[in-house]
């Protein structure tokens, strides 16, 4: 990654605190992590809608969606996966600075990468949501047919099958998508946000 000594950071005259005050809530990254098929996208879509309906400034970044544009030049090697998360972390930080409750849904299999995003943000601005679901259940669901392709060898380095997933050890929130409904999971997250005075 090239760096230049000729680049200067320009501060805005509108602060993050001012934006949060105008929005009537704090800003943070609500970072969903979990296996493919665990329900990250499904629950994050429902959460974004609930926050929006409650009048909150919110935006969702989805793993598949960003690979159509921002990260379309990245593959799925360990290095590219890490770069994928690094870029998303930087975008999420900008959105937090803009005062938004930023919902992200990425497998983000490596603990080091997730902690790297946490380190970009101020204290309490990174809310890790572990979307807990067994490989067996994820494979049973297989909404995109990816597990079938991974088992046949069509997709190498597939998280949970032929590539590792490092589950969070101390996430702020764990949702049990194998047993709880979408509504229950969203309710659990909203409750956390209210109890910790984000909203």
From Swiss-Prot:
Q: In which pathway does it act?
A: Sulfur metabolism; hydrogen sulfide biosynthesis; sulfite from sulfate: step 2/3
Q: PANTHER family from the xrefs?
A: BIFUNCTIONAL 3'-PHOSPHOADENOSINE 5'-PHOSPHOSULFATE SYNTHASE, PAPS SYNTHETASE, ISOFORM D
Entry EC number(s) = 2.7.1.25
State what protein this is by name.
Adenylyl-sulfate kinase
* Sorted UniProt keywords: ATP-binding, Kinase, Nucleotide-binding, Phosphoprotein, Transferase
Q: Can you cite a GO biological process for this protein?
A: sulfate assimilation
Cited InterPro entries: APS_kinase, P-loop_NTPase
Segments for region (Disordered): 1-22
Q: What does this protein do?
A: Catalyzes the synthesis of activated sulfate.
């Amino acid at each position: 990654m090239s760096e230049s000594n000729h680049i200067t950071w320009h501060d805005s005259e509108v602060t993050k605190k001012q934006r949060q005050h105008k929005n009537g809530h704090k800003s943070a990254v609500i970072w969903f992590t979990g296996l493919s098929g665990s329900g990250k996208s499904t629950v994050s879509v429902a959460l974004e809608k609930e926050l929006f309906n409650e009048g909150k400034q919110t935006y969702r970044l989805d793993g598949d969606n960003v690979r159509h544009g921002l990260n379309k030049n990245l593959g799925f090697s360990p290095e590219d996966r890490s770069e994928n998360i690094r870029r998303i972390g930087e975008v999420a930080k900008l959105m937090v600075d803009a005062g938004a409750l930023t919902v992200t849904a990425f497998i983000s299999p490596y603990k080091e990468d997730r902690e790297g995003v946490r380190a970009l943000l101020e204290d309490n601005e990174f809310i890790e949501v572990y979307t807990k679901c067994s490989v067996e259940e994820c494979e049973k669901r297989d909404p995109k047919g990816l597990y079938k392709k991974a088992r046949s060898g069509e997709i190498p380095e597939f998280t949970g099958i032929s590539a590792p997933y490092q589950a969070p050890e101390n996430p702020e929130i764990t949702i049990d998508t194998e047993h709880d409904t979408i509504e229950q999971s969203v309710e659990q997250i909203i409750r956390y946000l209210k109890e910790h005075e984000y909203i």
